[in-house]
A protein has these predicted regions:
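Short, well-ordered beta-strand segments in beta-rich or mixed alpha/beta enzyme
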Residues: 7-14, 52-89
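Positively charged, small/polar-rich N-terminal and surface patches that mediate targeting and assembly
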Residues: 18-20, 24-34, 38-40, 67, ...
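Long, hydrophobic N-terminal alpha-helical segment
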Residues: 2-28
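Generic preference for well-ordered secondary structure
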Residues: 6, 17, 25, 66-69, ...
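Short amphipathic alpha-helices in soluble, non-transmembrane regions
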Residues: 23-29, 85-93
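Glycine-rich beta-strand-turn "strand-cap" elements at beta-sheet edges
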Residues: 2, 34, 40-65, 94-128
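A broad, low-specificity signal for short, low-complexity segments enriched in glycine/proline
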Residues: 1-4, 30-38, 72-76
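Residue-level signal for secondary-structure boundary sites
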Residues: 20, 80-82, 121
Length: 128
């Protein structure tokens, strides 16, 4: 099965004392993204961020000791679908309302972000 998806990937710091509020925000935001064309929306919290000889995600976003590092991606069936979804999400009034009211500590200026086309996709038969 060759499914060459397109993804938006991102890494960002969130204050640890606001993780619950951020999680609630992301649950709502994920549904909006899927409503506008995303196939999947995933975010993970950093648990093991150091490997000798490499630059850590925490360094990448200048995370402090009081911040958790989140890594996520949004999956689309194509770049075209992603571009349309980005436009729709940017114009969806629910997004600004959610972020403004969430008290989640989200700061887009500290987020590292980019769009990526598929290079290799190797999955186990039973993989999620």
């Amino acid at each position: 099965m060759d499914m060459a998806h397109y993804i938006d990937g991102f890494v960002l710091p969130i204050p640890r004392d606001r993780l619950s509020a951020y999680e609630n925000l992301v649950k709502a935001v994920a549904e909006i993204w899927k409503e506008h064309g995303a196939l999947d929306y995933l975010e993970y919290i950093g648990d093991d961020l150091t490997l000798e000889g490499t630059r850590s995600f925490a360094d990448l976003v200048d995370a402090t000791e009081d911040e958790a590092v989140l890594f996520g991606w949004v999956v689309f069936d194509s770049r075209e679908t992603r571009d349309l979804a980005n436009e729709k999400v940017a114009n969806d009034p629910r997004m600004a309302e959610l972020v403004a009211s969430s008290n989640s500590g989200f700061n887009a200026k500290r987020m590292v972000y980019g769009g990526f086309r598929s290079l290799v996709q190797s999955r186990s038969t039973g993989a999620v």
